[in-house]
Amino acid sequence: QAKLDVVILEVGLGGRLDATNIVDNDMAVITSIDIDHTDFLGSTRDQIGFEKAGIFRANKLVIIGEPNIPQSMLAHAETLGCQLFCRHLDWHFCQQEQSWTWQTTRKDEKVRWNLLADLPLCQIPLANAATALAAVQKLPFEISLETVKKSLLEVELTGRFQTMKPASLTHLAQMVQREVEALPRMIIDVGHNPHAARYLAEKLTALKAKSQGKVIAVCGILKDKDAIGVLTPLLPLVDEWCCVTLGGYRGQHGEDLFVTLQQVATQQHLSVQGSYLDS
């Protein structure tokens, strides 16, 4: 009805049975594959890969940013005759200290740019940015390099390593600069699987290399999530854990999370609070 030039649909869960899959797409994009939502998608990467491959369409483009592609996904793409454009096989990226580079691995690849150097670092996982850039390379209309670089500088994802100001500090504007700088940095991240936890650990590692002080984690996890898998990458980086209760029927009680943490966090201080507001 709106006669849009481009429609981007984000799959909510899996792909094959997701509501967004009623739309026939011209291009399917897979960012990553990890163990999550096992009650619905299966307990192995091969099962989950097949479910995600459900968004593929016959003879259409498929962009894959996952470096370790499950065989089930490749087999489904072959059955449908999809045009694959995959990380490592067809393109790759490399991060430098202040920038990054995107490049095709085959000189005969039909893309807009075979090599993009000195790209600005961005606030989202670089693998995701590189996958999005791979999709841009295959779009049937022009996008300028200036637009690409501007977008990389401006892109952000709410709730992913997001720095927050304490809501109670309504007088922040009246505070002198040294008082503001003395406030603890508050970072929120809604990652809920091991893959997201590993990315958070990378960000915390980089932050701790530049800053001094303790890392206090206020943590709540749903009952159906892999708590050990999420917590383990963060253990070397967190000094204190505060376990909180999440609401809803899937919410895990802080006391239960505390017991789980005791199994793996043997060196850190642990505590329990009723909610994140209490903490």
Q: Would you name each region that the model predicts?
A:
Residues 63, 67-72, 78-81, 85, ...:
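C-terminal helical cap/extension that packs against the catalytic core
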Residues 42-50:
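Nucleotide-sugar donor phosphate/pyrophosphate-binding loop at the beta->alpha transition
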Residues 56-64:
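Short loop-to-beta-strand entry elements in the cores of soluble alpha/beta enzymes
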Residues 5-9, 19-29, 33-37, 47, ...:
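Nucleotide phosphate-binding/pyrophosphate-handling subdomain across enzymes
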